[in-house]
Amino acid sequence: MALTVCVRHLTGLPGTHDRQVRLCFRGFTQKTRKIHCGREADVGELFRWPHYGSPLAGESLSVQVVNCSRVFSPRPLGTLVISLQQLQSAGHLVLREALVDERLRVSPIQVELDLKYQPPEGAAGTWAEEDFGTPIRDSLELIIPNVGFQDMEPGEAQLERRAVALGRRLARSLGTQDDEENELELEPELEEEPDVEISGVVFSPLKSRALGLPRGDPFKVCKAQDFQVGVTVLEAQKLVGVNINPYVAVRVGDQRKVTATLRGTNCPFYNEYFLFEFHETRLHLQDLLLEITAFHSQTLPFMATRIGTFRMDLGMALDQPDGHFHQKWAPLHDPRDTRAGTKGFVKITLSVRARGDLPLPPPPPCPGTSSDIEKNLLLPHGVQAERPWARLRVRVYRAEGLPTVRTGLLGSLARALHDQNVLLDPYVRVSFLGQQGETSVRGEETAPKWNEQLSFVELFPPLTRSLRLQLRDNAPLVDVALATHVLDLRQISNSGRAAGFNPTFGPAWVPLYGSLPSGRLRDDLQSLNEGLGEGIWFRGRLLVAVSMEVYEGRVEPKPSQTTQRSGLSRLTGKKKKKKEKTRQGQTPAGILQPASASTSEDAPEIPSAMEVEVEDLLPLPENALASFEDFLLFGVLFEATMIDPSLAKKPISLEISIGHAGRQEEQSGQGSRADEGSESSTLEVQPLLESEDRGAGQEEQELLGTPAQWPEPVDGNGPYLCLPLRHRKPCLHVWSCWEDYTWRLQSSNSVCKVAERLDHGLQEVEKMQRRSGPGACTRLKQTLEELVAGSRQFCHGAERRTMTRPNALDRCRAKLLTHSLNLMARQGLRLLRSLRLNNMQRTVVLAKKLLARLRFLAQEPQPPLPDVLVWMFSGQRRVAYARIPAQDILYSVVEEERGRDCGKIQSLLLTVPGAAPGEVCAKLELFLWLGLGKQAKACTSELPMDLLPEPSSGLPQSLYRDDFRYFQLRAHLYQARGVLAADDSGLSDPFARVLISTQCQTTRVLEQTLSPLWDELLVFDQLIVDGRREHLREEPPLVVINVFDHNKFGPAVFLGRAFAAPRVKLIEDPYQRPELQFFPLRKGPQAAGEVIATFELIELDYSGHLEPSVPSDVEPRDLASLVEPISGHLSLPPSVRPVLRAFRVEVLFWGLRGLGRVHLFEIEKPQVVLEVAGRRVESEVLPNYRENPNFTELVRHVTVDLPEQPYLQPPLSILVIERRAFGRTVLVGSHIVPHMLRFILQGHEDPQEEEETEEETRDLVPHGPQGEKSLPEAGTSRQLLKAPLKKLTLGLLGQGPELEEDIPDPEEMDWWSKYYASLQEFQGQPSSDDEMDEAGDADGTHLISGDREAQEQGETDSKVSVPRKKAIATLKIYNSSLEDEFSHFEDWLSVFPLYRGQGGQDGEGEGASGHFVGKFKGSFLIYPESEAKSFSEPQISRGVPQNRPIKLLVRVYIVKATNLAPADPNGKADPYVVVSAGKEQRDTKERYIPKQLNPIFGEVLELSVSLPAQPELTVAVFDHDLVGSDDLIGETHIDLENRFYSHHRANCGLASQYDVNGYNAWRDAFRPSQILAGLCQRCGLPVPEYRAGAVKVGSRVFLTPSEAPPPDDRKPKVTSEASEEAQALHVLRRWQEMPGLGIQLVPEHVETRPLYHPRSPGLLQGSLHMWIDIFPSDVPAPPPVDIKPRQPISYELRVVIWNTDDVALDDVNPLTGERSSDIYVKSWVKGLEQDRQETDVHFNSLTGEGNFNWRFVFRFDYLPTEREVSVRRKPGPFALEEAEFRQPAVLVLQVWDYDRISANDFLGSLELQLPDMVRGARDPEHCSVRLALDGAGPRCNLFRCHRLRGWWPVVKMKDMEDVEREAREAQAGKKRKRKRRAGRPEDLEFTDTGGNVYILTGKVEAEFELLTVEEAEKRPVGKGRKEPEPLEKPNRPKTSFNWFVNPLKTFIFFIWRRYWRILVLLLLALITIFLLLVFYTIPGQISEVIFSPVHK
């Protein structure tokens, strides 16, 4: 099925250049190699294209010849466009044609082509000669233009396109990093190859009828399970507030927990762990809200002030690897003030685990710095730290087709009284990230119109995945949910850079689904209306639109014009009542405002608070949506079988519906336009077989259901029923009217086809890999080629696809799909080019990621059509249903856009609503077709030709047939594996029922087995298969295999169901022998094993005169030879049965452990029976199990015939029985080993498979050494668990220039020094004296693997650099149990758990753990019997120690526990450890640790254990209670026996380096040389030879490092004996590299073991950090290692406050207006708030200067390694004991203003981390606010320098008072600034990342002195200025403001600083006095002047 083109020859080429021929067909371009030639060129290359089964008529092939150049772009020489219509009819053409140049002239260049066409069905098309009747008058008419051909893009245009793309990437601020990396990484490929090259792609056919699980899969249900949400609140930083008392509240769902309250700090440290448990479905858990809120505690608890809140849903955490956020900072924002910026950060660790998840304990938390907050935020990958505010607008317009029946008590009473439907009062509730908004209530309407907009304010992008729309009924008593729809924000938005867009949706209809409308008082399926599960009933649809507006900048607040009617969580308002409802047309015009009217030309303003606003909208215009079109849903019921026998009493009918159309209760099928009147709702659809328009009187009568028929039993021996549909097939057709948005679903179907081909190909590849057969790499290559070709075809087709009435989401989604598929084609091409045999697994993993992306893109968020519901009626009652997406059956003219099930017979499984998962009520074979009414003619085109419609004028009412084609089905059932146990014995009596069509047959019953080997052939004769004969190969019928457990006294118990597709053999097809396949069994959502079988569907031959018979080429044709003489069953034919080969199975019987009671009796004489392939191997009967549970006869063997293929070999069954009196046997337990591959003798492989593999990979793997190297496979969660435990730097070794100070004295180091150095090493930041590679070069040597002859002689000339010895020895830290690292120590002794009872070993959850009855310890070895003759003794006994009792000394080292589950009501626990083995028990109850969830134990417990009596060690953590019994927190179990006997030597770990004494003294009972000698003796090697710098072991030579001097040049006395021990230790640590004999030995380690509780299996209860040492009692054991916790060192910190300067002046003199402050300093160490100290008050400081000379003295306990202060105090007022709390060593300095009457005013603060504090400035002039920044330098460690003095700034966050003061100063226009305001702005204030401004409010001169308590007692000092060593009183007056005592100072501050003002005032006063005197004397002088002459 392909077009093949061979380019043979080129002639007439100009000049000599590099030529290349390019061929383009349907948008796919392929190129030849570059040929350097002259005028002629021989090409000789072959190319192939797929055609998807569509004809070539109208298609063309474009051929172009270009000149290639290394510098310039390719220059085209000529083009030829060939029509392929003649090729379609001829099948083969040889052409020699001339090319046409750019000016459309015939050029002299000619090309010779050989074209071949392979049609899809082997027949070519027809040639339409009339299409070529026009005579050709010009040579130009030879050219057929190709509309899809485009000229090559010139260089300028390509450069411009890249510039535009780069500009878009830079302009867009949001996007995922992965997308950008992919684009940038593929950019060079785009420059070299503008088109993707593919060749020879043949697309695989897509199966629909029997593809895996059918469409009506009842297993896809929501199953509730147990989840744990763990939240560790570590610390908070940069909390906004002044002298706050913060605590953090964590809320998950409805559960809320709070931390302790810390006083007077903005950077509290908590380290508290909270555990939340839920029993929910995963879907519901994703929607739960995580809310982290910081509060400022007040005097009364309910008066706490909110600082900030962080919200996200748990779905974000589930999307992370392992559902884990580790030590991330959650940014806090105030919902009431969105303009305030970030309010602080809370550092948390978040984990979400389900039952059974692999434990991933986080590293122990430690206080971190705030320097990397912005780079380590609690945000998903790709989300930027700076998130702007955004407004999400949800526009709710109207609803249609709502239910008319109210449920509940009042609805039932109303219907009983009035006998009529009770209309609803609907309203819509929208939920978004904890916020809820509601529309108004529309009373008693089924088609309400709201036209309202709900606005939500949230940060962008929002940390949620869902937007929930819920339609509710405003009932009188309690509101009821009618239906729920969840919009996935990931589907309506994209964060990519190239095709990203903000959340947008609609306007579009949202379909609503829920439960069946019932009149009962209680709806059992009400959860479906709440959105918990898939709805089973169409409840109407809702017209909504969603948009999001992002605010980029900060805008000043403006008065809002909208009315707020609802608020956060419905606290600020209530929804409208009925009396407030507003009907359309009654709203005043002035009030009705469209949403877009509020937008103006100005930038939108940021809302002031997170409030939900409700606004009115204008109705949506009439032409906003697409026009209505008539749709036809056509169906034909071919088969109804597998019907439950309980439905036999009533007739059965069937109904299909889409929306409301098609329901038997609905008389009108026009639900979508029912409210528009009868004229508009009249259906005008063309009849099926008529081209004229339908008249009103010729409308079709809808068939709303099939005729009721009585069911009949199926043929055969099955209990099922079926409907008699042999001759007549009923038809169903439903007309409905919807908006025509079918192009949405067609585009989605195209993506689905690409995904389905990729999925099908990957499944086949995995099957081939499972069988280890050839062809897997070739099939993977073909799959990737199909991916590339399908993606490119979609991109080319998207350019021609038209969209009618698209909205914003449609346009954005079209761009996204084109970009994503284009990118996926390039990624697939990259995988295709890099595909090799050694990286196949990695390629499959990457291809699965592409598949997941394709499936996500294929989901249409705006479905235009509701789903199709198929209902089965029993009488008048609905009993079963199936829901089919309309997308799957939608018709399109283009095949790629057609639904996968459209026009095909599909298998549907009907399930009962609300039934248990896995229950199937019926199976249907149904033909469905959905399309436009104008395309109705095509609905019957895909029906089988032998079906004839009944005579009618329109659509057929039913189809009938007279002639039948008969088939024979041969069901070859070989075996089943892993079947569930159904009997109390832990076994089953399984049999299988095979059902196809209306026939059912049953296999024989095999008793007491979980792996039945039926080896049976079931033959179904005279089988009628519906469907087109030519489509049966691709669409075979479905075969159902039901496995049951046979009960003698009762019905059979269902065990599982599998589905299979038979291989179809038509008469003309050659016969192929079938191969056995695996079909998984499932029981609901639970895996129930697998069936190995194969099925053949053979068409019977009609050529004879007698009855139809099997064709002659079928083998075997006669089945009589397969009949078994005893049972009468047919056995498998030899061609199907696997080829058997004699194998020897050797069994090692070691012993039984932990057997419990059976039927209330103790086990006394057990025996082990092994069954494999019908043969049994029995062990001896233990004479007394209690005294010695080990077997004395260890090895037995048996010869069995097993299949040569390992994947077909049967499982091994292990049965443990007990021999009781009178010959009775009782089954104790059983175990099934499903695969025997791990027990096959190493080195035995199938030579035939090796040859085939070599032949297959010869062309795929490059030759040479590069092809032999294997790439690392993709990591798994198990590999992640094996990664070393990491922790933040603890500073034991220091960094930078202080490194030399950090090298401690070996005499001062202990085990904890080694432990913390190991933590630092595994963090990936080794110190300068430890620069070795962690992957295996820690000792600086390599295993010599040079020339083989040199290796045999033990010589080598390689040189290895020898590093110096580590300053501190380290150990290995595992963050999982040691068993996970070393395969459970089952290298030669395996442990098989025994189960008994129903459920077996494959049960889930609590049921599985309840069936455990003991363990069998042993092993197996399988190898061909032909090789057994060459062995003198059993191979399994090699290296097996003696099986005798032995006594051991076990030392259990308990380091600490992390994240323990709380056991007390206060959220804490009082843990202690209990270690037990049998009756031996040790505990630390007397040394329990109160009120801790992360206790540090440091305990060593010793036990004397004897094997095999006490093989298991139990380590449990209990909670100590004063009253009552202690509670178990969790426990872990360790198999001591396997550890002791393992070749990994797990009894005592190997140290990293050899030391005789000290903290790293050798602690094993044997020296390294003795251990190495013992290994050589066990492996048959000679004694190792020690040389200078090398050790020879066998034929290998290890280079070993010599003892290099330490870095301080100390010359140790190293003896030759110690040197040999160090060399032997080096060889032991690299023992795994010994060829054939090497195995990794356990190093010195600390393992992390998960703790579980028996009542909650699978749920992690914490982690225990520990290790154990095991020593034989006959060897003297070394002394135990001291791991007692380090006691904190008591320090005394002396802080002298000398002076302050530039302190903010907070008080104002009411008389003079002068500002001043009464300064005093307050200080304390965090965690010791009760020891808070204050200086005296410096009153009336007018310059900010203060003089104190005051000493603070603080005593605290300090842990140097952890850098924490240890505080012991009672956690509460009612606590009886003190608990230990740890805080970072931080000193707080605060400057306050003293007030006599009101509360004191806070001026500023400074927090200094004592281990890492900034050095102070030398003088106040150089002290700026920069010293208060994070990471300011230079820095020092006060615990090392011990004494420090300087000036430090105190800062304060700018508040409104500071802003007002600055505004007043600016308005006053002061010319002289104070001294403290002088300087640059960056020295006075700074802005943090949250936008908060901090200002400099003063400077403090202080002196710090740190002493140990012993030193302090030798030189005591007094507090304040007291003795001893008193400080002088400061040089300040007693009263700073006294005009008489201090007149000079008064003069300075009140006269001198204002002398200009005083002079001006004096001058004005003099002038005023002068004027007053003038005016006072003027009248007298005037009168005197006037009257003086008179007197004279």
From Swiss-Prot:
Residues 554-606, 661-686, 691-710, 1245-1276, 1322-1361, 1862-1885 are annotated as: Disordered. Keywords: Calcium, Membrane, Metal-binding, Repeat, Transmembrane, Transmembrane helix. Coiled coil: none annotated. Residues 1-1952 are extracellular. The keyword Transcription regulation does not apply. PROSITE patterns: C2. Residues 559-569 have a biased composition (Polar residues). Residues 1-97, 214-330, 369-502, 951-1078, 1126-1250, 1430-1549, 1675-1824 form the C2 domain. GO terms for cellular component: membrane. Its cofactor is Ca(2+). One of its GO terms (molecular function) is metal ion binding. Ca(2+) 2 binds at residues 1464, 1519, 1521, 1527. This is Fer-1-like protein 4. It comes from Mus musculus (Mouse).
